[in-house]
């Protein structure tokens, strides 16, 4: 699924998107996207570029979390058995993209069926995350059911100190909308 940032979508497409209903709204985190891959019979975290140095660090860190009760690899295996892929954001000082995070976290973003491309519903994702004691991305239910344009305006007016939101539209398209706070913080770095 292709994610678009505002400004990446052409004017004609933007006019069409503006009235689309927001199906799901979640927090946009500042980190490195990783996902589960079954490699030689072993579940691993990979980045979009493959089994990189960052992926090695994520895997090491996730193994260490087992002693604290989180079972990241159990979640990956359960999702794989259902023919799906879990996507996470790796955040913290070791993966700073724009803003320094104090705490290292691996946050479940979504789970998607590999064949149909269907995203699991929010309740399934939350129950899976809870079962394996894995943190799940924050949702903004107050934005759901509204048009993209309404949500875009609300996010821009928000005083929330967050990067922004990821919106899944009724068409299945995903769009990232950045907060004014975030854009100001990035410009002043």
Language model segments and positions:
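Core nucleotide-handling region used for phosphoryl-transfer chemistry
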Residues: 1-189
